[in-house]
């Protein structure tokens, strides 16, 4: 019986020593997956991933009930509903609600569109250098124009400079911006992207 306990003790001590001496630094190295650093778009996979994420962002705009509510209510398809916070009634464009900056989910479009525009800027700036197919850069141009169109139709004039210059990929957060006029948004961002 003694030799069995001795073997178990030796094996247990060896296993404990193995676990205590193993390094876990690789496990703790973080790989960011929700934001892009400047080197992300310097590879072909990075540019392709950026274009893929622009398609994925559509669910954050059109997948929300608030967006459907603002587009469908007042038609013969649907009428306003009610939610716990009352936002559905306020977003109703058939005249039942009172749409203001404090009573609607305008942040859903604002935040999603600008992050997608920044991704498109990164793809457009780096796509040719990486050597990807021009169609991927064209898709990024379309999405940038599409997002600016949604923004300008909803909010009027919106900023073209996200912090690094007009229509440039921004890597540092900016809390200030200058609102461009509606004609500027169309002539600098929407029409040129759709025509190239």
Where are these regions (language model features)?
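Conserved, well-structured interaction surfaces
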Residues: 48-52, 56, 86-155, 175-187, ...
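Core domains of carbohydrate- and sulfate-ester-processing enzymes
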Residues: 78-86
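Bacterial N-terminal signal peptides that target proteins for export
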Residues: 2-12
């Amino acid at each position: 019986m003694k030799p069995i306990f001795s073997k178990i003790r030796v094996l247990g001590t060896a296993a404990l020593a193995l676990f205590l001496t193993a390094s876990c630094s690789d496990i703790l190295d973080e790989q960011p997956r929700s934001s892009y650093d400047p080197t992300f778009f310097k590879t072909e996979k990075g540019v392709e991933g950026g274009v893929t994420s622009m398609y994925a962002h559509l669910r954050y705009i059109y997948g929300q009930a608030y967006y459907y509510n603002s587009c469908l209510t007042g038609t013969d398809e649907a009428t306003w509903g009610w939610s716990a916070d009352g936002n559905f009634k306020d977003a109703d464009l058939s005249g039942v609600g009172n749409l203001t900056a404090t009573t609607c989910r305008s942040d859903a479009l604002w935040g999603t569109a600008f992050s997608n525009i920044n991704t498109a800027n990164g793809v457009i700036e780096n796509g040719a250098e990486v050597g990807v197919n021009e169609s991927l850069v064209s898709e990024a141009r379309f999405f940038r124009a599409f997002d600016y169109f949604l923004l300008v139709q909803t909010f009027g004039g919106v900023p073209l400079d996200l912090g690094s210059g007009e229509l440039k990929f921004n890597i540092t957060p900016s809390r200030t911006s200058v609102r461009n006029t509606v004609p500027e948004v169309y002539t600098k961002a929407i029409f040129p992207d759709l025509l190239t």
